[in-house]
């Protein structure tokens, strides 16, 4: 069933300061419509060509050498360094925190395996297929950007939600990169995810960035509505809003080495 583009997600309502009860009281939305919105799963998007399957990475980073464990699940959830290497990943550090919930019931889903992967801060993947356009001019400033491999960036990681459905990752903001310079097409900064919620279908999606301290934030916001992956997935304006995460300094003051974003995955039924 095609989603209606005028529908508002819970996250959008809260961001606009409208409030759920205000919508109900003001007659802008029926209780049945609200219930339907709160049950919409996280929008699906493509896996992409750079998932870390065995034999694909340029550098086969494997922190966990357990027999039978796929390389995509062999690294921890802190991607800002590689165990055994003296150095830190380049780029703006971020923390992504949230829960894995059932879209149908709203209940937490523990023991969900979450695989996350992305490009480096300069927009280069640890993947043999990512071998083109290794330098390009910034579309706004004209500065030449070199898409370089970062030996201190982990590139992919694995988290498992706890009994309350909580998960977290620590990583860097990946760079945007060109997919067709002549057509002026670029992929905005994004994180890839593959989730395996117990007793639920697998979820594959991507999350995007927004925030005053996010590198190339203004450019990323311009690129998002015309992104080929978003368009191919058939995301509406509201769907897109649901997969953009706002990042800012930690309001509690506990996290001092990076920006913090929050996102709850809603697993399909």
Predicted regions, residues:
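Compositionally biased, intrinsically disordered low-complexity segments enriched
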Residues: 8, 18, 194-196
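N-terminal secretory signal peptides
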Residues: 1-12, 21-22, 26-27
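Beta-strand-dominated extracellular/periplasmic modules and repeats
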Residues: 34-244, 256, 260-268
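Peripheral, solvent-exposed domain-edge segments
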Residues: 16, 250-251, 268
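Hydrophobic/aromatic-lined pockets within catalytic cores
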Residues: 18, 22, 105
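Short amphipathic beta-strand and strand-loop transition segments with alternating hydrophobic
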Residues: 245-253
């Amino acid at each position: 069933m095609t989603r209606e583009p005028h529908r508002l997600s819970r996250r959008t309502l809260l961001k606009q300061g409208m409030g759920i009860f205000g919508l109900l009281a003001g007659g802008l939305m029926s209780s049945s419509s609200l219930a339907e919105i709160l049950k919409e799963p996280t929008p699906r998007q493509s896996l992409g060509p750079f998932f870390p399957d065995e034999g694909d990475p340029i550098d086969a980073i494997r922190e966990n050498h357990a027999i039978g464990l796929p390389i995509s699940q062999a690294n921890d959830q802190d991607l800002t360094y590689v165990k055994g290497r003296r150095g830190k990943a380049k780029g703006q550090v971020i923390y992504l925190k949230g829960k894995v919930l059932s879209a149908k019931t709203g209940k937490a889903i523990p023991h969900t395996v979450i695989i996350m992967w992305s490009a480096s801060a300069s927009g280069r993947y640890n993947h043999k297929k990512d071998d083109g356009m290794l330098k390009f001019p910034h579309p706004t400033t004209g500065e030449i950007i070199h898409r370089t491999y970062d030996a201190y960036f982990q590139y992919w990681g694995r988290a498992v939600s706890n009994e309350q459905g909580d998960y977290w990752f620590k990583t860097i903001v990946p760079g945007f990169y060109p997919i067709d310079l002549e057509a002026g097409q670029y992929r905005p900064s994004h994180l890839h995810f593959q989730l395996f919620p117990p007793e639920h279908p697998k979820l594959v999606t991507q999350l995007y960035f927004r925030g005053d301290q996010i590198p190339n934030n203004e450019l990323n916001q311009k690129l998002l509505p015309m992104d080929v992956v978003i368009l191919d997935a058939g995301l509406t304006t509201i769907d897109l809003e649901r997969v953009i995460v706002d990042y800012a300094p930690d309001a509690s003051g506990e996290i001092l080495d990076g920006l913090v974003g929050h996102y709850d995955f809603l697993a399909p039924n």
